[in-house]
Amino acid sequence: MKEIQLKGGDVHGIVNVVGSTIARKCGQGVYIHSGPEQAVASTKAFTNMVASLLLFAIRIGRTRNFSREKGQSIIKDFERVPELIENYLANPGPIDEAVELVKDAKSVLFLGRGLSAPVASEGALKL
């Protein structure tokens, strides 16, 4: 962040806590208002940051060649996330099998590339 600012770049923060160090140092950005964090690895803050980045990406895309319809389609799909999570929790399926495989493991390697890389990092942090 410092390096970008030293070179004249703008830094925008996506933060949960008003007045946090990142919020103060950036001076501009978005507050996601996820509520108090119970742990450093806060799932709700991570999820809300991903949602904010999705909206930000759509907004940037609209300034280029991203159609309004495509943006609306992505938002419509994203609005289904709570329903999809509820469906999963009601019937976890093959994830239960994966849990059985790793529940007694001494170590687990999380892999992800592209858009899945931060999710893999978050999973590793939480396990």
Residue ranges and their predicted role:
Residues 18, 28-126:
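Active-site phosphate/pyrophosphate-binding segments
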Residues 15:
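H-loop (His-switch) motif in ABC-type P-loop NTPases
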Residues 1-12, 21-25, 32, 63:
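Secondary-structure transition/capping motifs at alpha-helix termini
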